[in-house]
A protein has these predicted regions:
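Extended, largely alpha-helical regulatory/partner-binding modules appended to the mid-to-C-terminal parts
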Residues: 1-136
Length: 137
């Protein structure tokens, strides 16, 4: 796995899982910290976001359609499935289809920004600020 990460520019799975968990937990600071670690490590930001979106998609599918677990198990490890089930099942999870929509928009904008992490940072602020406003309202 370390060789694959080095050759492809893919981030460690732990970074992706921490990032996804931070978003789902509504922890903007933690999500931005994870994103900063990816930027500092020189990993490809587009690959990182693609992996993150994939995991969030699977977590959302496991939440709304648990019968798809077998299909998802063909794509990711058993350990990841357990992590994603936990993330999606937590009360107050910020895992929504709108979160995925925002991240997909950021994915498209990565190549257009002067700093590849900028579109992701903006999406995080939008996603988690909306969630904060809804929680307070």
């Amino acid at each position: 796995p370390a060789e694959v990460e080095l050759v492809t520019g893919a981030p460690r799975g732990e970074l992706v899982n921490n990032f996804v968990a931070s978003i789902c937990d509504g922890k903007l600071s933690d999500a931005l910290t994870a994103l900063g670690a990816v930027a500092e490590s020189g990993n490809d930001m587009k690959v990182f976001l693609k992996l993150s979106i994939q995991k969030m998609r699977f977590a959302l599918l496991l939440k709304v359609a648990p019968e798809l677990e077998k299909m998802i198990a063909e794509e990711i490890s058993k350990e990841d499935i357990q992590i994603l089930k936990t993330i999606g099942a937590e009360k107050g999870s910020k895992l929504t289809s709108q979160t995925l929509v925002e991240l997909l928009g950021a994915y498209e904008d990565i190549g257009k920004a002067y700093a590849p992490e900028l579109p992701i940072e903006l999406a995080l602020v939008k996603i988690l600020s909306q969630n904060d406003a809804q929680a307070k309202g």
